[in-house]
Amino acid sequence: MGDSGDAVMARWLQSAGLQHLAASSTSSSSASTAGGGVDPRGGGGVGVGALGGGAGGGSLLPSLLMQGYGPQSIEEKQRLYMLLRSLNFNGETAPPSISEPYTPTAQSFGGGNSLEGFYSPELRGELGAGLLDLHAMDDTELLSEDVASEPFEPSPFIPKEMDEDDDDMLPGSQPGPSDNYNAVANEKESTARENNVAKIKVVVRKRPLNRKEVSRKEEDIITVHDSSSLTVYEPKLKVDLTAYVEKHEFCFDAVLDEQVSNDEVYRETVEPIIPIIFQRTKATCFAYGQTGSGKTYTMQPLPLRAAQDMVRLLHQPVYRNQNFKLWLSYFEIYGGKLFDLLSDRRQLLMREDGKKQVCIVGLQEFEVSDVQIVKEYIERGNAARSTGSTGANEESSRSHAILQLAIKKHIIVTDTRRQRDRDANESKNTKAVGKISFIDLAGSERGADTTDNDRQTRIEGAEINKSLLALKECIRALDNDQIHIPFRGSKLTEVLRDSFVGNSRTVMISCISPNAGSCEHTLNTLRYADRVKSLSKGSNTRKEQPTGPTIPSSKDSSSAPSYPMPIETEEIANQIQEKRPVETSRKAAENFTSNSSMEPDRNPVSMIPSYSNRGKEENGSSGLNDRERVDLNSSRISYNSKPQSVQSSANLQEEEKVTKVSPPRRKAYRDDKPERQSNYAKKDSGPETSRPGYKVQQAKQLQQQQRPTSASASQNSSRQSEKESSCDDVEIDAILEEEEALIAAHRKEIENTMEIVREEMNLLAEVDQPGSLIDNYVTQLSFLLSRKAAGLVSLQARLARFQHRLKEQEILSRKKSSR
């Protein structure tokens, strides 16, 4: 049975990659049986020579190896390692034998506990701590260089489409799970790329010095440090005319120096926006800067490159199957008016439809499918654009040119009745998907630099600056996510209204001049751009305003504790009560019908003679309803009043309502406040003053005493006013008559003057005739001039009299008003 155990061990070692141990195990099998070895079938006894010189370990090895397939302890694993180490101390290796891999049988799983009683003293000495130090042992002999590698076979459960490319797929094959995974990954990448596109991007481009500036030996005052920052060195003079340089640093999304080409400008500004236009995005790209800074030069190639990329995307199957088409329109805004540059400068009208969408009536759009056609349209529009000469640029753009490239989806018409008119109304059968607008703004100007310009040029500059300011405010509102965007500030922002709402993107290219003479213009442009760029999302203006302290209404006041209010709190309540809206007073007036038991002298609300006065009175009186109830209850308890007193109090309440029709003045009420406070203090002093109808009786007596005097005074004042009004009417009628006479005299004088002028013209014509007499000319001219002078003198005298009458009337009116 020893040979069979050696064969099993050899096969197992080969399957485990330990072929070099097969020779040592085979040679030790005979020695193990002679020295009292271990039965290879996993017997019970172990001889003394089992570990003698390492020879007996070969028979112990198969049983230990078989234990690896069943449950084993840490000590058994350590014994296996020590036996494997003792088998190859001499370093002898045997050539690997080719055999089938060994598969253990069911009998081999039963030797899990065959060596539980095996504890060698030598093994106990080395493994006394119970743990094996693997770093202290030399296990390099366990590795073999002659390991036969077998070819790797893929798992049959993995689909083969994962290893194949999409281009190698068969035409009729269905997309597998890998296609869906790739589609999801691509969609995530595109979404991330769209999110990375900023809502507002500010790019600054510096132009090189031109010939005129080089001939004047002007210096370059702008230094571009990296792709996002620059420094402006502004030359200045101190008060003592000492020259110094002031440094200004700016940071933007991108800074392009004079070495950057237009292709790089396109890749930095417009190229990231093109893919998202096909996903219902409206983009705007405009160049801003002083006149002569290179705006038109920067903007000219951008629409061509954008059209090229858009046409390329339209040819893709995704968009071609959706019937997407590219449309082009080109117009300008000059002096607040719109002109179509592709239709012989025909004037356009801007209207709003029922959906609050801006529509340009009469604007002609052209469907384009080739970049060459786009180039021809742009050249045609540039030739018709308004230009002029300024002090800084001989051919300056005096209008805002807007080139729009729109992606529209064509709707297939199936009705035969509408099919005949489809060619005529092809643009109506489309649905807008996205749009990008390229705006070549007119140059900004300062009033100090336009002194040598004519009036028309200055008017153009004022209109340009107004529209640029409105555009800046719209961009600020857009970046702050404000609800209201002031697009009605100018025609430019009204036209671009749809580019500032919804899903929109804006790219601003600030063009600057590097010469020292344009330093102030450059700084203004950079500050304009920096103000647009520096807008943060955190400074949102749509924040909730802090709510101030609120005063409880009449409903809440009834539940409040009924304590007497001090003077300071009453004044504060009066001030806040005056600022209440009319609605609050109306609500209080409605509540007054249910809470009508109150006193007029205890009304804590300021009485203003206005239409909302009554509501405020009732509101304030209802506010002290509980306190009055406490007073009434105390008076009833102290005096044990009978039901007759209830009837008298009801009568008094009716009298109170009558007195409330004519409220007292505010001034008198304010003077009466200390008296009311003293009345509050005197409540507990005597029984008569605490009665609720006592003060009402006093008020009635005072009113009866004042009635005759007030009636007589009112009669006298009415008589005097009637006399004064009759006198005033007479004087006003006289003044009006004199005014009409003066106007008639002026008209007559104008007619006489015109007649005299005709006679003078005839007189000059006669003098020019040959043979005319100079004496007749002098005599007639003297007569005409005297007539003219007499008419002017009479008109001037009439005017002086009327002016004197007006002054007298003004003095009298002042005296009457002082009385």
Curated annotation (Swiss-Prot):
Keywords from the named record: ATP-binding, Coiled coil, Endoplasmic reticulum, Microsome, Microtubule, Motor protein, Nucleotide-binding
GO cellular-component term (any): microtubule
Signal peptide: none
Compositionally skewed regions (Polar residues) per UniProt: 632-652
Coiled-coil region: 736-767
Residue ranges with Low complexity bias: 550-562, 697-719
UniProt xrefs under PROSITE patterns: KINESIN_MOTOR_1 (PS00411), KINESIN_MOTOR_2 (PS50067)
Biased composition annotated in UniProt, kind: Basic and acidic residues: 577-589, 614-631, 669-686
Expression across tissues: Ubiquitous.
Region (Disordered) residue spans: 150-178, 534-729
InterPro entries assigned to the protein according to its UniProt record, in alphabetical order: Kinesin-like_fam, Kinesin_motor_CS, Kinesin_motor_dom, Kinesin_motor_dom_sf, P-loop_NTPase
Record flagged with keyword Electron transport: no
Name of the protein this chain belongs to: Kinesin-like protein KIN-13A
Organism: Oryza sativa subsp. japonica (Rice)
